């Protein structure tokens, strides 16, 4: 490797990966001003100077049916990436998330003497744990957002570096509620519940009804309660409004385009589906209840495949049931309302419990606030310069 102008390959498959890639390139340019960046990039990585082989949107498909439909195209892109990388011989290949695409590329490149890093651990600690053996063969190092992920890799002697979470860097330890209310143009003197029904169509389909019925029950108990419903895009908004028209046509809601983070910062409590939103709610210091429903067969299989005691990231990070998880049969309006009312109540004990929970959230936030972009760049530099065990 030329120490001053390495060729660094990065492949991102969706917007979240493009954000990570752009932050990583920015930090790497500070160390290697003449580095060359190639791969598959979105608009943010392109703005940082990465040359892309194809439009990143070509990789951005979700759901099994959609993947099968586009499989020939995805396989062609993967073959093209492998051929290009074997010709270009980059000093390192960084697969950013998209494990179903990137791990096969990494496997081929590592076998041909190219250094590889997988940025963002697949949820191998939770399910399909046998993937760890493929990851070990495919990568020189995994960059993990969360400390329990590194602990899992350590058990299998797979090189892994905990770098902290970029979201923990982006959200302040003490979020500004007044500022969030101003951005949303809502009255900070009111009491708010944020309702996040998920970003996927299937989540909205299964969760909109119990979440709306929960809101109706809570409005009876807290008549002044205001409801904030951020929706990720127009498609999900139309889907949600259609369900609301049947379930709760007269329920007054603040429907918000995007801005889930501001809604959670402004809210006194949050009702949400599991996933990254639960981590974001924790970082926003919003007491939450996690509700999740899926098809009975999917749940039957998931129960047998998932190897963790909890499904939400705050509980996994704390290794205890910090926030209620109401899954499948327990995801009922009555139980959800009961758990949320404990956060919304003005009782002295409820206020105290809320403060204790927020302190727990703050402690966990500090654990994963490590300047992840810089840590990721340092891991790449160490691998390039032969110091990966430092």
Swiss-Prot record:
Record has DNA damage as a keyword: no
Task performed by this protein: Condensation of UDP-2,3-diacylglucosamine and 2,3-diacylglucosamine-1-phosphate to form lipid A disaccharide, a precursor of lipid A, a phosphorylated glycolipid that anchors the lipopolysaccharide to the outer membrane of the cell.
Pathway info: Bacterial outer membrane biogenesis; LPS lipid A biosynthesis
UniProt keyword terms in alphabetical order: Glycosyltransferase, Lipid A biosynthesis, Lipid biosynthesis, Lipid metabolism, Transferase
HAMAP family: LpxB (MF_00392)
Chain coiled-coil ranges: none
Family note: Belongs to the LpxB family.
One example of a Gene Ontology biological process annotation: lipid A biosynthetic process
This enzyme's EC code(s): 2.4.1.182
Keyword Transferase in record: yes
PANTHER family according to UniProt: LIPID-A-DISACCHARIDE SYNTHASE, LIPID-A-DISACCHARIDE SYNTHASE, MITOCHONDRIAL-RELATED
One function term, GO molecular function aspect: phospholipid binding
Protein name per its UniProtKB record: Lipid-A-disaccharide synthase
Pfam family, one: LpxB
Family matches, as InterPro entries: Glyco_trans_19
One GO CC annotation: membrane
Reaction catalysis annotation: a lipid X + a UDP-2-N,3-O-bis[(3R)-3-hydroxyacyl]-alpha-D-glucosamine = a lipid A disaccharide + UDP + H(+)
Enzyme's top EC category: transferase
Superkingdom, taxonomy of origin: Bacteria
């Amino acid at each position: 490797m030329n120490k001053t102008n390495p060729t660094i390959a990065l492949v991102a498959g969706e917007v979240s990966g493009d954000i990570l890639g752009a932050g990583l390139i920015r930090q790497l340019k500070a160390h290697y001003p003449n580095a060359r960046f190639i791969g598959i990039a979105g608009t943010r990585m392109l703005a940082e100077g990465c040359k892309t082989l194809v439009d990143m949107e070509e990789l951005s498909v979700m759901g099994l049916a959609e993947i099968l439909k586009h499989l020939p195209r995805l396989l062609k892109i993967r073959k093209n990436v492998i051929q290009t990388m074997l010709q270009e011989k980059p000093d390192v290949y960084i697969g950013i998330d998209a494990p179903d695409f990137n791990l096969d590329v990494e496997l081929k490149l590592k076998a041909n003497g190219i250094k590889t890093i997988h940025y963002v651990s697949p949820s191998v600690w939770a399910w399909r744990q046998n993937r760890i053996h493929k990851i070990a063969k495919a990568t020189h190092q995994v960059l993990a957002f969360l400390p329990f992920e590194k602990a899992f890799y350590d058990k299998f002697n797979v090189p892994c570096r905990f770098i902290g979470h970029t979201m923990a860097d982006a959200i302040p330890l003490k979020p500004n509620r007044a500022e969030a209310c101003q951005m949303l143009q809502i009255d900070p003197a009111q009491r708010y519940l944020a309702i996040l029904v998920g970003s996927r169509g299937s989540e909205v389909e299964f969760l909109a009804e119990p979440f709306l019925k929960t809101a109706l029950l809570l409005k009876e108990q807290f008549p002044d309660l205001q409801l904030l419903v951020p929706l990720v895009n127009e498609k999900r908004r139309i889907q949600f409004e259609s369900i609301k028209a049947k379930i709760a046509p007269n329920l007054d809601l603040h429907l918000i385009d995007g801005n889930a983070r501001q809604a959670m910062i402004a809210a006194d409590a949050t009702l949400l589906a599991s996933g990254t939103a639960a981590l974001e709610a924790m970082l926003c210091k919003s007491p939450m209840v996690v509700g999740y429903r899926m098809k009975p067969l999917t749940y039957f299989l998931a129960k047998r495949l998932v190897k963790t005691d909890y499904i939400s990231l705050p509980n996994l990070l704390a290794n205890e049931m910090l926030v209620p998880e109401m899954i499948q049969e327990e995801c009922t309006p009555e139980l959800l309302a009961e758990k949320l009312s404990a956060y919304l109540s003005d009782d002295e004990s409820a206020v105290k419990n809320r403060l204790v929970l927020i302190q727990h959230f703050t402690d966990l936030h500090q654990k994963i606030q490590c300047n992840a972009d810089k840590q990721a760049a340092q891991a790449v530099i160490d691998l390039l310069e032969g110091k990966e065990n430092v």
